[in-house]
Amino acid sequence: RVYQKTSNGWKRIKDTTATSYTDSAVSVNQTKTYTMRCIDKNGNTVSGYNSKGWSKKYTPVTPTISKLENTSSGIKLTWNKIAGVYGYRLYYKTSSGGWKRFKDTTATSFTDSGVSPNRMETYTIRCIDKNGNTVSGFNSKGWSKKYTPVAPTISKLENTSGGIKLSWNKIAGVYGYRLYYKTSSGGWKRFKDTIATSFTDSGVSPNRTETYTIRCIDKNGKTVSGFYSKGWSKKYAPVAPKITKLTNTSKGVSATWNKVAGVYGYRLYRKYAGGSWTKVKDTTSTSFTDSGAKKGKKVTYTVRCIDKNGKTISGYNATGWSITRK
């Protein structure tokens, strides 16, 4: 049975069958005094104890960085928890060989985003109290890791009016990204360098499946990461066009709609109250003036995409867009 000395005498803190015990309820620079006695299986004391006890001032040991790993956000540092301390102070080694403080935290991990591809980073750590004073030593050699950007992940592929929109995660320390699509022969073909984290591929065809991958590049256009060799795939299905403007003109109702990537043309429909949709015009343009609209009547239009054979290849807005013909 282990006891610690309090202002009111000895306080029991632990019964154990082992021959060692670690007291984690400690404070920095606190001196604690312990004693102990034997017990039987029923918890009865069966020995005396040292009434003076044994004392120890608690000084936090130096933390150990147990893991350094490359992530999409930078180098992630993980270290062991130290009992009784408020937090930790991280340092990195400068080019001149000194240590520079860069983060105070109460956690036991942190990701350094201030990294550069292929640059070696060296870190060390020490404990701090709630006032920011250091309360432990530190490993003067530190722990080192070369930052190698991880391959980006395409997180979303979606059909839009502009084509297939690709979105991917940001990778720390890189200049930009290089996009590739898979060719019919199975190889990868580069088609776009960008510093953004999304891009819309307009070079698509209806019902064709496109496969993409991506890697990081530096400012000179050199690749600095690997890539996902299987890629991410999406079948391009044209979205329904949207009529953006309806105007009365001397020749009829002028309808204008947005362009949809990869399609041959568009089919315009009209209907009147209580009626059904009637085809007005097939066109490769994104506007048309309907001279057949009845004057004084509320007329509603919608539009869908067609291929070169006149087959519809998109849905349409069933509510449509309306105007009263003057």
PLM regions and their residue ranges:
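Recognizes extended acidic, P/S/T-rich segments that occur
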Residues: 2-28, 89-118, 178-207, 267-294
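Hydrophobic loop/turn residues within beta-sheet-rich immunoglobulin-like superfamily modules
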Residues: 26, 71, 82, 115, ...
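Conserved aromatic anchor
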Residues: 74-84, 162-173, 251-262
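Beta-strand-rich modules
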Residues: 23-42, 112-132, 201-221, 290-311
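Intrinsically disordered, low-complexity linker/propeptide segments enriched in Ser/Thr/Gly/Pro
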Residues: 1-6, 13-16, 22, 34-38, ...
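Proline-enriched interdomain boundary motifs that mark the N-terminal boundary
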Residues: 59-68, 148-157, 237-246
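Extracellular fibronectin type III
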Residues: 41-60, 130-149, 219-238, 308-326
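Arginine-selective low-complexity/disordered segments
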Residues: 1, 10-12, 30, 37-38, ...
